[in-house]
């Protein structure tokens, strides 16, 4: 039935809009129909003269959110915020990571979300330095940092919140130092956001702030900030981008070279992750912070 319908409709149009790389089966079907059309041209059969990737067009539409969409995303963010607060209150040494995840999911469902927008990251201690660690059976310890990256989906729109905090309720001095560096970088990145700037400008600001912080703390020695940035020495500790588009998907579609416009929604979530290394003082080991 689909083949017959496509054949009938394609004979009526000069332009074909198709989502490239979305379905191998659909592409094969369309290609076979067009091939048959070309072989029948002598008999007067018409066929599309141009083929466009409709994915790029749809992506550009999805980049700009209207008031209704933003309202939905705000509600999703509210649910996720409450879930993070619930998890923080529940958190204490002796709990398992999966127990914290269960608290998040309970709050999502309680307020109308059908499911998480992405697999929840609940990472304690050394796991906080693993970017996409899924909640496991590790037991939280007194001196751990707990990193939670979790968000719900509501009415087709995703939310994405990351928070990092001490399981004991009190930062050690090294933990606080790293936390303050990351928090400052996030605030500075947010400050410059406005229509017209390049998407990656906030990332550049976050990189500079974190690089300076790493120098000040002593995690990077004998290097100027320009040397750190030029040689990407910060990537030992901050190896991902600061943000991504957010919308119907948590990593939503859209061209990152597009200047920012009113209605675009994206995350700002810098981080710093210090894995054990002989070059680094042990007091900083296994501190993973993302905000």
Predicted regions and their residues:
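Active-site neighborhoods and metal-handling regions in enzymes and metal-associated proteins
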Residues: 1-291
């Amino acid at each position: 039935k689909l083949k017959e319908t496509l054949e009938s409709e394609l004979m009526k149009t000069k332009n074909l809009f198709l989502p490239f790389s979305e379905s191998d089966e659909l592409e094969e079907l369309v290609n076979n129909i067009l091939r048959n059309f070309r072989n029948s041209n002598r008999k007067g059969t018409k066929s599309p003269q141009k083929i466009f990737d409709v994915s790029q067009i749809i992506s550009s539409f999805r980049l700009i959110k209207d008031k209704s969409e933003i309202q939905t995303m705000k509600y999703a963010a509210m649910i996720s915020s409450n879930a993070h607060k619930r998890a923080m209150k529940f958190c204490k040494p002796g709990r398992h990571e999966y127990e914290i995840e269960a608290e998040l999911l309970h709050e999502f469902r309680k307020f109308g979300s059908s499911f998480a927008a992405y697999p929840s990251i609940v990472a304690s201690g050394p796991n906080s330095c693993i970017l996409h660690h899924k909640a496991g059976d590790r037991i939280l310890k007194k001196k751990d940092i707990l990193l939670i990256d979790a968000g719900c989906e509501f009415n087709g729109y995703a939310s994405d919140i990351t928070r990092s905090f001490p399981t004991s309720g009190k930062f050690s001095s090294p933990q606080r130092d790293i936390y303050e560096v990351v928090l400052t970088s996030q605030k500075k990145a947010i400050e410059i956001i406005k229509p017209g700037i390049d998407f990656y400008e906030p990332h550049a600001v976050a990189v500079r702030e974190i690089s300076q912080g790493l120098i000040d703390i002593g995690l990077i020695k004998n290097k100027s900030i320009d040397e750190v940035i030029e040689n990407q020495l910060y990537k030992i500790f901050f190896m991902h981008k600061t943000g991504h588009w957010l919308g119907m998907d948590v990593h939503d579609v859209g061209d990152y070279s597009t200047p920012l416009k009113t209605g675009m929604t994206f995350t700002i979530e810098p981080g710093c992750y210090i894995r054990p290394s002989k070059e680094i003082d042990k007091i900083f080991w296994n501190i993973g912070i993302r905000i």
